[in-house]
A protein has these predicted regions:
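Conserved FAD-binding catalytic core of PHBH/FMO-like flavoproteins
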Residues: 114, 157, 161-268
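Active-site-adjacent segment of FAD-dependent monooxygenases/related oxidoreductases
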Residues: 39-117, 216
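FAD/FMN-dependent oxidoreductases across multiple families
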Residues: 66, 237-301, 321, 326, ...
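N-terminal Rossmann-fold NAD(P) dinucleotide-binding loop
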Residues: 14-15
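A conserved short coil-to-beta-strand element within the FAD-binding core of flavoproteins
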Residues: 125-139
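Core beta-strand elements of the Rossmann-like FAD/NAD(P) dinucleotide-binding domain
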Residues: 3, 147-157
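Glycine-rich FAD pyrophosphate-binding loop
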Residues: 22-43
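Helical substrate-recognition/capping region of FAD-dependent monooxygenase/halogenase enzymes
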Residues: 1-4, 8, 24, 33, ...
Length: 524
């Protein structure tokens, strides 16, 4: 075969998948029908969970240098700031990156693309997928090359990361269920001064919709995203000057617009693929789900799709696991996409409804509710975990098993394991647990008890074992995360808990690996 995996689409999702496969020794062929990486972008927000993954890829530091950290989000109504979500304060103990990083899709693609080239894989641009045929063993893909010729390549698996107009999805006959919104958005890169909170996200609510101001690199540089007023929706020759007056009025506060370097209008859809897999074909990112920009979730969700699938594909390609492991991709990620679509659709509908009652609620009631909610610790934590995507869980997955005896308040199977700062040797300095984990392998954490002296038979290089001894510093940190002692956690390569229990039993780990992960273990 020409490749183990054909990755169609070299946007953030495809590049993330290709990087993760390359790290695990999987041969990926990456194609994209466009001439090169995107130069302009609507996607901006990089969430905490994505930054945690970037750290494992080795690109988080350049991302932080390129981006702008937004440690809070502010709600404005009629020129008054009515509520604030303090992301940095809420998430300080939940993630190494308790903020929203404002970094354009183009910059994300450049970082991921450079990392992929450093791993020896180049994107084949101007190469279009025009045909697919699969049998029990492989795919045959017909590709249209830059000179117009058609060629054929073979691969064991195909990943459709080719966006909302996905050729992979269409050629596989998978329905894309949903509809477009009637509203027309605009986006503008502007130089502006005013009363907005610097270095934070500013949300302006008005009777017919909302405007968002994202802080960008450079003095007084902002990205403005908004909804066109009804009377401008059918105009095709709009310039930013055409919307300035309405923006000033709708924001309800003094704004001094100095320069606009880019302006564009667009419509958005809310759609989800009927399924994320067709035998040897998978859908990821915008090819699988698209939704409103509420919450800056779209690009991040695609990146997590890729992170979820990559380790599973690598195990199957290497022969380390049976193909049944791949069933868990759709079972885990489709509910996430549907839940996100439902949540963002409801929020978006509330924010843009033309109904006078909805407008009244938006400008008079919502702000008061938000202000009260942000005074409650439980709501603040829920908001951070939801927005940052650190709260995504797979409790119903076939890969999730919590053994009897583990108290209900402790992290459970399917959860992202908490970020902790721990000592792994007596009297040693505390370490960032996430930096110690090996995300190309499974990680077994033995807490307040010794790990098996001879490891776990049959898992070998697939497993890294970490002992967390009981001492005053560790006890405080574990108690904060509600992790009991003794306990143990088997973490999947993507950082989610696969198996959790109290007293570590190597036989239980072996059984889990064989029966749930479908790993080929000698003697089982």
């Amino acid at each position: 075969m020409d490749a183990d995996v054909l990755v169609v689409g070299a946007g953030p999702t495809g590049l993330m998948l290709a990087n993760q496969l390359a790290r695990r020794g999987v041969r990926a062929l990456v194609i994209d029908r466009h001439a090169g990486p995107s130069l302009q972008t609507r996607a901006l927000g990089v969430q905490a969970r994505t930054l945690e993954i970037y750290a494992q890829l080795g690109i988080v530091e350049p991302a932080l240098r390129l981006g702008k950290r937004a440690t809070g989000a502010n709600l404005w109504v009629q020129g008054r700031r009515t509520a604030r979500i303090p992301l940095g304060d809420i998430g300080r103990d939940l993630s190494p990156y308790p903020f929203l990083l404002i970094l354009g899709q183009d910059d994300n693609e450049r970082l991921l693309g450079d990392a992929l080239r450093d791993r020896g894989t180049a994107v084949q641009w101007n190469t279009e997928l025009v045909g697919l045929a699969q049998d029990a063993n492989q795919f045959r893909a017909s590709l249209k090359y830059p000179d117009g010729t058609i060629g054929e390549v073979t691969a064991a698996w195909v990943a459709g990361c080719d966006g909302a107009r996905s050729a992979v999805r269409e050629l596989s006959g998978i329905a894309f269920e949903g509809a477009p919104y009637e509203h027309v958005f605009f986006v503008a890169d502007i130089q502006v001064t005013g009363s907005m909170m610097p270095d934070e996200l500013n949300v302006y609510l008005w009777r017919e919709g909302f405007h968002l101001l994202f802080p960008m690199r450079g003095a007084d540089h902002w990205r403005l995203v908004g909804i066109l007023p009804t009377h401008l929706r059918e105009r095709h020759d709009l310039k930013f000057e055409d919307v300035i007056a309405s923006v000033r009025q709708e924001m309800g506060t003094a704004m001094s617009f100095k320069e606009c370097s880019w302006f564009s209008t667009y419509r958005i859809h809310h759609r989800c693929a009927a399924r994320f897999r067709d035998r040897r074909c998978f859908l990821l990112g915008d090819a699988a789900h698209i939704h409103s920009p509420v919450g800056a979730q779209g690009m991040n969700t695609g990146l997590q799709d890729a992170y979820n699938l990559a380790w599973k594909l690598a195990l199957v390609v290497s022969g380390g696991a049976g193909a049944a492991l791949l069933d868990s991709y759709e079972h885990e990620r489709l509910p996430v996409a549907r839940r996100l679509l439902s949540t963002t659709d409801r929020a978006f509908s509330l924010l843009v409804s033309d109904n006078w009652l909805a407008g009244l609620f938006r400008t008079r009631v919502l702000a008061k509710i938000m202000a009260f909610a942000m005074s409650l610790d439980r709501i603040r934590l829920f908001a951070f975990r939801t927005i940052s995507q650190t709260g995504i869980r797979y409790p119903q997955s076939a890969l999730s098993e919590t053994l009897a005896g583990l108290r209900d308040s402790a992290p459970r199977a399917g959860d992202r394991f908490p970020w902790l700062r721990l000592r792994f040797q007596p009297n040693s300095p505390t370490e960032n647990l996430f930096a110690r984990l090996d995300d190309t392998r499974f990680n077994l954490i033995a807490i307040g008890q010794p790990a098996p002296a001879d490891g776990v038979p049959g898992l070998g290089d697939l497993l890294r074992i970490h002992e967390v001894p009981s001492d005053a510093a560790n006890d405080r940190e574990l108690a904060r995360a509600q992790i009991p002692q003794p306990s143990f956690y088997l973490l999947r390569p993507d950082g989610h808990v696969g198996l959790a229990g109290t007293h570590l039993d190597a036989a239980a780990v072996i059984r889990y690996a064989s029966e749930r992960l479908h790993l080929g273990i000698n003697g089982v």
